[in-house]
Amino acid sequence: MKLTCVVIVAVLLLTACQLITADDSRGTQKHRSLRSTTKVSKATDCIEAGNYCGPTVMKICCGFCSPYSKICMNYPKN
């Protein structure tokens, strides 16, 4: 019973620490370019929308490859 209580308290404490750190670190990322998807997609040679993207193609799609038609498609706009 004591071990169960200790485990529950430890989990709650670690969860609280995670939430506190997540709130404090918003907007303070030092190297934003490392996580930028636009720079990665510009630097990567990719297949444009409307072209074949099956298993024999060595490049990746700029958007996503449709699993049924094997045609590259752009991501839908939100």
Curated annotation (Swiss-Prot):
Tissue specificity field: Expressed by the venom duct.
Residue ranges of the propeptide: 23-42
A GO MF term: ion channel inhibitor activity
Disulfide bond residue pairs: 46-62, 53-65, 61-72
Function: Omega-conotoxins act at presynaptic membranes, they bind and block voltage-gated calcium channels (Cav).
Family stated for the protein in its record: Belongs to the conotoxin O1 superfamily.
Notes on the domains: The presence of a 'disulfide through disulfide knot' structurally defines this protein as a knottin. The cysteine framework is VI/VII (C-C-CC-C-C).
UniProt-recorded name of the protein: Omega-conotoxin-like 12
Phylogenetic lineage: Eukaryota, Metazoa, Spiralia, Lophotrochozoa, Mollusca
